[in-house]
């Protein structure tokens, strides 16, 4: 099997799994309990929180553990909407967002909130002039992905934050899920930020919402204080510790990982550009981990299925998106519905080998010849 879907899920690093198992065996107490075992568990999760905060450049009190980025996005957007409902009911986002953002905004729209989506330029970045046009006194939040999962384009978050300084009632939520481990991530100018461990070689089931200390968001899960008043439940100490380990490894090895992936991306671009019917949708300035392409007149789902039959795993849109609909991100940059329907994504890793790239290109060549001959 050739796995080229690392944007959907990454395999857990052996060192991260070892950390999880060691802490799970050692810390048997509930971190909320007032005895020796509970104190030991609390000390472990506090140490993990301090480490994570240091790596992300935030305060430990700004970290809320969640089950993943989907919960964190729901928590942030619903919490900000409720917090600011007396100031306004207008929210701005983009057509590039993960379904946990777009779905939450749809739910808020059904509750009477007004949602506007930013235009996306041909380079894949949001139109800042359109943002300025859409902003008004009733705008309570802007939700934007730091790096979109389908094209790999990094959005101008710091420029957005600078624009929002003129709107004191408007908060900025950033979904950094795809960015962690691929680019440096900053919380500067941001009010809430989401991420999840399974995108950077950690375990599934643990994520973070980073929240400015002065924001009093209503919890999604009630029931008493845990590691924070904002999320009830017994904290999973080993998962928190494993996230800290995975994040540490991702930050330390970031330059080497990016260099390796960039070389593979360049090889793919060079090889795929020789096919007249292939259109590469990811801009040159996108992160090298993601390469989105279309094969003219062949639906992305069909091409994915043929590659899968040959042992190659790629993705059509986000793994959490609905099937049968064109990619919103690709349509936003190309304005071509047929091209968006034909699009699919290769996502690379520092674990991807040269031999895997060669084998993929061989499988691609066979699929391309077979499928384009039918049209």
Question: Where is each model-derived feature located?
Answer:
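Pyridoxal 5′-phosphate
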Residues: 1-375
């Amino acid at each position: 099997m050739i796995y080229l879907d690392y944007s959907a899920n990454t395999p857990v690093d052996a060192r991260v799994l070892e950390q999880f198992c060691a802490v799970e065996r050692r810390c048997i107490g509930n971190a909320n309990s007032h005895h020796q075992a509970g104190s030991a568990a609390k000390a472990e999760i506090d140490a993990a929180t301090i480490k994570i905060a240091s790596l992300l450049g935030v305060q430990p009190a700004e970290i809320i553990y969640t089950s993943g980025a989907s919960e964190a996005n729901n928590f942030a957007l619903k919490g900000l909407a409720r917090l600011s409902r007396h100031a306004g009911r207008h929210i701005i986002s983009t057509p590039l967002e993960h379904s946990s953002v777009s779905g939450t905004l749809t739910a808020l729209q059904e509750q009477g909130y007004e949602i506007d989506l930013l235009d996306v330029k041909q380079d894949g970045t949001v139109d800042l002039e359109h943002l300025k046009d859409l902003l008004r006194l009733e705008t309570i939040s802007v939700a934007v992905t730091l790096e979109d999962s389908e094209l790999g384009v990094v959005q101008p978050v710091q420029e957005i934050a600078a624009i929002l300084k003129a709107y004191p009632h408007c908060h900025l939520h950033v979904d950094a899920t795809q960015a962690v481990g691929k680019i440096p991530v900053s919380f500067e100018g941001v009010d809430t930020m989401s991420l999840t461990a399974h995108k950077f070689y950690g375990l599934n089931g643990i994520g973070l919402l980073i929240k400015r200390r002065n924001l009093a968001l209503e919890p999604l899960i009630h029931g008493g204080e845990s590691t924070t008043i904002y999320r009830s439940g017994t904290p999973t100490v080993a998962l928190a510790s494993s996230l800290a380990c995975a994040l540490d490894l991702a930050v330390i090895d970031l330059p080497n990982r990016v260099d390796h992936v960039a070389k593979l991306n360049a090889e793919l671009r060079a090889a795929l550009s020789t096919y007249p019917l292939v259109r590469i949708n990811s801009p040159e300035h996108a992160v090298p981990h993601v390469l989105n392409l279309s094969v003219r007149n062949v639906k992305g789902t069909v091409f994915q299925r043929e590659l899968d039959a040959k042992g190659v795993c790629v993705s059509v849109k986000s793994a959490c998106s609905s099937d049968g609909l064109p990619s919103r991100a690709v349509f936003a940059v190309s304005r071509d519905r047929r091209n968006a329907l034909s699009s699919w994504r290769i996502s690379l890793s520092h674990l991807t080998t040269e031999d895997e790239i060669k084998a993929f290109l061989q499988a691609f060549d066979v699929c391309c010849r077979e499928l384009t001959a039918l049209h």
